[in-house]
């Protein structure tokens, strides 16, 4: 079970939002590169970046901050990025800059064929982000709620080579209310693509529940406010997850 620190970028700063509300942003750092280095020093094995301005604008808006993060990371760990990725040219540029995996969100909902094109052009480098409120998929920086069900959409991507589905429960994001285990498990059981949980991670109980769900296809969780507010220590939490993964794997064997 991989705990993946999130670095959400707004106006060049590292922030955390509450339920995706851009007006409820807490600035945690004005130096994104230093924040990336901090999480690496805490044992991060992967980083999750989101260009929040880009998600609303439909194109990248924090490229200088992204580049400062990539410079700080070097080749130490993989970096994935979502927010405002709408065309193949942007994906190619990001991969050339050092991003390991792009996350297609709004474009995956509005134009699923774009995901197939991206997977064909850049195999092994594409994830899909499905963000939902009360089971309905949201787009455009969570500002619009569609009529799409998460599972129905996710199934469209099964045979195209998508690396993972990042499933975010918007109502829990930034609220420290616990991961929506039930919905995450339901999605993982319904599709063949690995699932990364997002939204609400708050304590070791969440980590234990996620580790139990690993055999169903839940491969990781995005860690946001919990590690920024020090409710969870990243190094200790990842160590605990590793121990649980080994424990439950032995039970399966």
From Swiss-Prot:
Disulfide topology: none
Stretches that traverse the bilayer: none
Protein name, per record: 1-(5-phosphoribosyl)-5-[(5-phosphoribosylamino)methylideneamino] imidazole-4-carboxamide isomerase
Coiled coil region boundaries: none
Assigned EC number: 5.3.1.16
Pathway info: Amino-acid biosynthesis; L-histidine biosynthesis; L-histidine from 5-phospho-alpha-D-ribose 1-diphosphate: step 4/9
Listed InterPro entries: Aldolase_TIM, His_biosynth, HisA_bact_arch, Isoase_HisA-like, Isoase_HisA-like_bact, RibuloseP-bd_barrel
Keyword Cytoplasm: yes
NCBIfam families named among the record's database cross-references: 1-(5-phosphoribosyl)-5-[(5-phosphoribosylamino)methylideneamino]imidazole-4-carboxamide isomerase, PRK13585.1
Pfam families: His_biosynth
Family the entry assigns: Belongs to the HisA/HisF family.
GO annotation terms (biological process): L-histidine biosynthetic process; L-tryptophan biosynthetic process
HAMAP family, per database record: HisA
Keywords: Amino-acid biosynthesis, Cytoplasm, Histidine biosynthesis, Isomerase
Molecular functions per Gene Ontology: 1-(5-phosphoribosyl)-5-[(5-phosphoribosylamino)methylideneamino]imidazole-4-carboxamide isomerase activity
Catalysed conversion reaction: 1-(5-phospho-beta-D-ribosyl)-5-[(5-phospho-beta-D-ribosylamino)methylideneamino]imidazole-4-carboxamide = 5-[(5-phospho-1-deoxy-D-ribulos-1-ylimino)methylamino]-1-(5-phospho-beta-D-ribosyl)imidazole-4-carboxamide
GO terms under cellular component: cytoplasm
The UniProt record lists the keyword Kinase: no
